[in-house]
Amino acid sequence: MDVKIEQSWKQRLIPEFEKDYFNQLISFVKEEYRQGTVYPPGPCIFSAFEHCPFDKVKVVNLGQDPYHEPGQAHGLCFSVQDGIPFPPSLVNIFKEIESDLGKPVPQTGNLLRWADQGVLLLNATLTVRAHQAGSHQNKGWETFTDAVIHHLAEERSHIVYILWGAYAQRKGAFINTSRNLVLKSAHPSPLSAYRGFFGNKHFSKANDYLIATGQTPIEW
């Protein structure tokens, strides 16, 4: 199957694209787009990869599911398109950046500026039916995104993995902590942000590690 995805990722993921689960997944996703509203827009499904080639990845931030309301999701976890109000988790992310780094809350919740610096903003599930959180879970996306993380874990080192919440921490449990920095805390959701997300200083810790390993820090 010819999948439109950034070339450096494509060459590594071709074996995945040939597997039965992936063909079943794509058939399911195509039918979902045909029958109703699905987010993100089709051309944005693999945006995280387009903006962050394999060899440029410095930070991996694992999310779970795309936003499921109009205009929000555009292929990067936690990010929303320009002009869209910030969802609660993103509000809390910006609050932590302000507390950690002293940076004011930005005008836009579009995190493409992070992706273009080497932050892979990867949801475990890359599509969702409108207004139905989790509606495309357990259809195959998780297997695909596991393969993505395995390629990074096997071929690259000195990457910062940011794992917020139990789901992301389970998904990243196999990552080698001696060759990478793995940062874990509660999720920025209002349900859990006060149980360990606020004050985690993950943004400064990530940059300190990047500098220590000879890399350029991220302008969060």
Identify the role of each PLM range.
Residues 1-13:
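Generic N-terminal amphipathic, Lys/Arg-enriched alpha-helix
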Residues 3, 15-163, 167-170, 175, ...:
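A polyanion-binding, active-site-adjacent surface
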Residues 199:
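Short, conserved glycine- and acidic-residue-centered signature motifs
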